Structures are given as C-alpha cells and as structure tokens.
Design a protein with these regions (language model features):
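Bacterial N-terminal signal peptides
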Residues: 9-19
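Short beta-strand and strand-turn-strand segments in soluble, beta-rich domains
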Residues: 47, 102-111
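A eukaryote-biased signal for short, well-structured alpha-helical docking elements
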Residues: 21-36
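Beta-strand cores of secreted/periplasmic/IMS beta-sandwich domains, seen most often
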Residues: 54-79, 123-131, 135-136, 153-154
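Extracellular/periplasmic metallocenter environments
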Residues: 26-29, 107-156
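N-terminal edge beta-strand
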Residues: 33-62
Length: 156
C-alpha cells in the first residue's frame, strides 16, 4: 500500500504549479492548476474583428487565452455562457467603465473575461473550456459587440 502513495503523490504534485508570493518575512505558496494550452487572439488596426474568428478546443481543457491588441482602440474579450445574453451584457457594459466594460453584476453569466487591453497591450485570462457546444466570445467595449465577436467551439 505504501508503494502506491509515493507515485500518486508525485503525480498530483506534477499536475499542480506553484507560485510564491513574498508577504513580509514569510513566503506564501499558492497552488495553481497547470495550463493545458495557450490560445492567442488578436485585434489589428481599426477593424472591429478578432483573429481568428473561430477556435476549437476540447471541453475540460484549462486554457490560457492571450489577447494581443495590435489595434488602435481598446478592447476586451468576454465569453458569456449563452449568446442570448450578449445584447444585455453589451448594454450593461456601458455603465461598467470602472471594470474594463465588463458588467461584473452579471458575472454569473460569464465563462471568462479579460481586463481591458489598450492599443499595443497584451492581456491574459485563464479558464476551463465548458461542456461541448458553441460559445461566442465578444468585445464589450461600447459599440464593439455588434461586429467584434468570434466562436469558441467546445469539442468532446
């Protein structure tokens, strides 16, 4: 029985990354789940489009989404649980400037969201890909949601 404890403990330790945070004279250890894959989405110039417009990832994958804003306007990336909520989220975003135009009062309707990326800035968000289906990712900066969106396809 003791032979199994060491390999299992080692496997669990290998699946978790740790970050160290200095807090005065002591160090605090934070466990973080390992990232399975990194996806890069970009915005360029003055066009209100994400590139690529479609992504496919296996459900349950832990993703680091890196958004590179090479555009001339600020943008964010928001993944709602349902495309039916996008219009309401976009309206609520107008009053959410303090939170990067992400309506945090509606946080339960969101799978993931980035901070606001100024032109030339790169931001990241980490999330677990939801159950199989199609999910829309959208920019909720005022006036962008009608044309700046893409599709995240969650695969089995």
């Amino acid at each position: 029985m003791s032979r199994l404890v060491i390999p299992i403990a080692a496997a669990v330790a290998a699946a978790v990354l740790f970050t160290v945070e200095p807090t005065g004279e002591r160090l605090r250890l934070h466990a973080q789940a390992a990232i399975d894959t990194t996806i890069v989405i970009k915005a360029s110039g003055s066009s209100l489009e994400f590139s690529p417009p479609r992504l496919s990832v296996t459900n349950g994958t832990r993703v680091r989404l890196r958004f590179v804003n090479d555009g001339t306007l600020p943008h964010n990336v928001v993944i709602p649980r349902s495309a039916e909520d996008i219009d309401d989220l976009a309206l609520d975003a107008y009053g959410a400037g303090e939170t990067g135009y992400v309506p945090l009062a509606d946080k339960d309707k969101l799978i993931a969201y980035s901070t606001l990326a100024s032109p030339g800035q790169t931001v990241e968000v980490t999330f677990v890909v939801p159950p199989p289906g199609e999910y829309t990712y959208v920019c909720l900066f005022p006036g962008h949601a009608n044309s700046m969106f893409g599709t995240l396809r969650s695969l089995r």
